[in-house]
Amino acid sequence: DLEMNGVPKDNKEAFESSHMEIIEIGAVALDEDYREIDSFLTYVKPRFNEIIEPRYEEMTGISTAMVKDAPGFEVAFEQFFRWCIDLDKEYEIITWSSNDELQIRHEMKQKKYQMSNEVKQFMNGWKDFQKIMGEMLGLERVLSLEKAIELMGLDFQGRQHDALNDARNTAEIYAVVFDDKRDKEALNRVKEALHPKTEGASLGELFDFSQFVQS
């Protein structure tokens, strides 16, 4: 999972490539039994706006002081990449929505990051679990991570919009969906809530439209 800060509009070249810059990368690794075996977390120092804007600080809890001595995007991404490939020769990158993959690609362009063949292969293997789950449940709109956790009757672990916490909650939903040993009652609650019983709920309550709003 990623957390981000805005790029100033007056920096036209940088803003055209990406309106945002990554300020935190968080991930967890699951074994074949869907148990967490490792985690990754780093802050990232933004290049084009070193001041964390108040709305993003409030949302993420990340302050300017917290990223002041953090690695830049290139180093932080390499650390994350190496962490992934050092875990196992066979791995899958699972994200909640395609936004994280797209942000990394946009930021690579923005910062003129040169991808090695190994990194290209790594970037081509990401899976959008939000989309996969939506197709499994026959959803026509985007379900937010927080709403998925809520509808499953699970407790959101930690603070929202914390990269590691969001990654852990995504992993929890992934385990509920794919681990045959897990009770499927939580998944059934989502199906029941989103099909015949959605009439009394507004779309804003059930679905996440934030990814369609451009900063």
Language-model features: locations:
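Active-site-proximal helix-loop-helix substrate-binding element of RNase H-like nuclease domains
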Residues: 44, 51, 57-60, 64-67, ...
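Substrate-recognition/cap helix-loop segment adjacent to the acidic, metal-dependent catalytic center
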Residues: 99-124
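Short, glycine/acidic-enriched loop or turn micro-motifs at the edges of active sites
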Residues: 4-6, 131, 169
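A contiguous pocket-lining binding segment that forms or flanks enzyme active sites
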Residues: 123-132
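Acidic, divalent-metal-coordinating active-site segment for phosphoryl/phosphodiester hydrolysis
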Residues: 162-175
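Conserved non-catalytic scaffold segment of RNase H-like nuclease domains
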Residues: 2-101, 105
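Active-site catalytic microenvironments for nucleophilic, acid-base chemistry
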Residues: 107-111, 151, 176-180
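Acidic two-metal-ion nuclease catalytic site recognized across multiple nuclease folds
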Residues: 172-215
